């Protein structure tokens, strides 16, 4: 019988994960293991809606502002770091919360053993991307690994370039490293999904973008503008503001695009989450209902 339980909380961006997670963490008196691939960067707390200093005083958080934009970090590294944290915790319950699909999947199911990319290979491929463009990089991937080319998100330069880096560094296809074998974990997993009525969620997203602008996101984007080609800034919010800072759009157009692209990302998140039938879905305002479910699940697994 497994003696530890990992509670996983996720949901689309803007749904209200942070406050719900804080209340659940306080109930169990455990820290929050953050699962957000952008909130790890210390330079962009506003645009990533990272937990505030006040929220982090309420509950200890891991993986918030602990890296710089230039740092290389991956789902594979995250998997190992989180497993080490869970193993070192003396409490029977650990709490993982966030919206990064790959991070959550890496912890729950494991990730394939992909080779670490050499810095010179990464630099070479990023220069090729900048010089030749994403379409040409997709064509190259089609030549080197046609199987992965069929399934990769070809609008996501990070995914395309990473697959190419593997192909070029190892001389093998990226597909050959993907076993998709689910790894056994030494803990039980309870999966909680948070969602709201679609109109309510979209209104929250639209308002949150306006709040971010009010809190200083434009100034934040201006500070990191010299680093805008970094993959860590290839994300909703900053891409649109960089276009504004380049004089390609007005501020109103940039804000509209951020809202629209964030809503699109929320839909993508929900599509991915719904594939996993282990998630039990709740409105994030119904904390007591969530806690009752968690306690019931823990009780059932301990029998």
Tell me the role of every PLM-derived stretch.
Residues 1-303:
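Phosphate/pyrophosphate-binding catalytic cores of soluble transferases and nucleic-acid-acting enzymes
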């Amino acid at each position: 019988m497994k003696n530890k339980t990992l509670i996983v909380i996720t949901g689309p961006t803007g749904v209200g994960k942070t406050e719900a997670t804080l209340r659940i963490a306080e109930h169990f008196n455990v820290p929050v293991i953050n699962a957000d691939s952008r909130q790890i960067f210390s330079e962009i707390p506003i645009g990533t809606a990272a937990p505030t200093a006040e929220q982090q005083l309420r509950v200890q958080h891991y993986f918030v502002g602990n890296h710089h934009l230039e740092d290389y970090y991956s789902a594979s590294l995250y998997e190992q770091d989180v497993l080490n944290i869970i193993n070192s915790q003396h409490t029977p319950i650990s709490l993982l919360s966030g919206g990064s699909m790959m991070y959550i999947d890496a912890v729950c199911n494991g990730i394939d053993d992909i080779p670490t990319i050499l810095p010179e290979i990464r630099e070479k491929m990023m220069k090729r991307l900048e010089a030749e463009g994403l379409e040409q990089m997709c064509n190259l991937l089609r030549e080197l690994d046609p199987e992965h080319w069929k399934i990769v998100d070809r609008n996501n330069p990070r995914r395309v370039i990473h697959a190419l880096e593997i192909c070029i560094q190892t001389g093998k296809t990226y597909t050959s490293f993907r076993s998709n074998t689910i790894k056994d974990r030494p803990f039980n997993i309870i999966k909680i999904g948070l969602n709201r009525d679609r109109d309510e969620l979209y209104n929250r997203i639209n308002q949150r973008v306006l709040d971010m602008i009010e809190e200083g996101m434009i100034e934040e984007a201006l500070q990191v503008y010299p680093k805008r080609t970094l993959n860590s800034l290839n994300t909703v919010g900053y891409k649109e503001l960089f276009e504004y800072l380049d004089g390609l759009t007005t501020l109103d157009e940039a804000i509209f695009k951020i809202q629209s692209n964030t809503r699109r990302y929320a839909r993508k998140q929900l599509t991915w989450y719904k594939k996993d039938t282990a998630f039990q879905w709740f409105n994030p305002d119904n904390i007591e209902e969530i806690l009752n479910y968690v306690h019931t699940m823990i009780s059932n697994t301990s029998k």
